């Protein structure tokens, strides 16, 4: 189960996407998530899938990683799809089950909702797979820099977001280990009464919380040992430099947005 958790993992590489400035990648992903909702016909969705597929293939990250990125939210996607299919009224009725009806409009809305999930997950997965934790932190800090004017602790906030994101796969791996250890002791998580299943989760949560606090403490000690004192006076080994390729990425996204507006039905 935990091997399916891809969000938060970084795959080292030397593709052009790995070399893109993290500020450009973060901005592009945020903008892409916003323009996903501009698509309202199959031509616009086909255009967006072509754009994402190009980025995925040129990132040189195995495509299987992106498929695995969908698996943790499979049930959420399925439930959303079924709600759209059965409760959307309009179009031609294909199946009439009394209170529930399957219509052509419901199927179309369900398929489009599925496409939106896939596009958003692929883009966010692409961001974390091609951006190292340090780059992600620096990129977020630069983007949030204007908020320093209102005395927002930008550096600490960016670091917190980056660490939280990177801790997701670590905690999931830890959960997998504890789960296997509990099963080896005869604990059943998938059978019996619901009350028994809930009680069985407690031996899983307690060591998980202890492990999370221990890892957080170890990380804090390691950062202090390296002289970390927050953003004040901090120097960087690698400085972010905006390049022509970064501008091209944002221009391509602007062109995509313009095409989506033009092709909207």
UniProtKB/Swiss-Prot annotation:
CDD domains: EcfT. Its main location: membrane. One of its GO terms (cellular component) is plasma membrane. HAMAP family: EcfT. Belongs to the energy-coupling factor EcfT family. Transmembrane (T) component of an energy-coupling factor (ECF) ABC-transporter complex. Unlike classic ABC transporters this ECF transporter provides the energy necessary to transport a number of different substrates. This is Energy-coupling factor transporter transmembrane protein EcfT. It comes from Listeria innocua serovar 6a (strain ATCC BAA-680 / CLIP 11262).
């Amino acid at each position: 189960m935990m091997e399916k958790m891809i969000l938060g993992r970084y795959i080292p590489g030397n593709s052009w996407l790995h070399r893109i400035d993290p500020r450009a990648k973060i901005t592009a992903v945020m903008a892409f998530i916003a323009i996903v909702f501009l698509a309202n016909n199959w031509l616009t969705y086909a255009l967006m899938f072509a754009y994402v597929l190009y980025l995925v293939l040129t990132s040189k990250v195995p495509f299987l990683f992106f498929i695995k990125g969908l698996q943790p939210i499979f049930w959420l996607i399925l439930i959303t799809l079924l709600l759209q299919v059965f409760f959307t009224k309009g179009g031609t009725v294909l199946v009439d089950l009394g209170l529930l009806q399957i219509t052509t409009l419901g199927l179309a809305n369900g398929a489009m909702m599925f496409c939106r999930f896939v596009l958003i997950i692929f883009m966010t997965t692409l961001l974390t797979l091609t951006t190292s934790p340090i780059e992600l932190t620096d990129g977020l800090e630069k983007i949030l820099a204007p908020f320093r004017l209102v005395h927002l602790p930008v550096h600490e906030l960016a670091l917190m977001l980056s660490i939280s994101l990177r801790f997701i796969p670590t905690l999931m791996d830890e959960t997998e280990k504890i789960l296997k250890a509990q099963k080896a002791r005869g604990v059943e998580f998938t059978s019996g009464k619901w009350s028994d299943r809930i009680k069985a989760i407690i031996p899983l949560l307690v060591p998980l919380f202890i492990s999370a606090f221990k890892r957080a403490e170890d990380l804090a000690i390691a950062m202090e040992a390296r002289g970390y004192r927050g953003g004040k006076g901090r120097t960087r080994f690698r400085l972010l430099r905006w390049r022509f390729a970064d501008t091209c990425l944002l221009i391509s996204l602007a062109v995509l947005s313009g095409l989506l507006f033009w092709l909207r039905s």
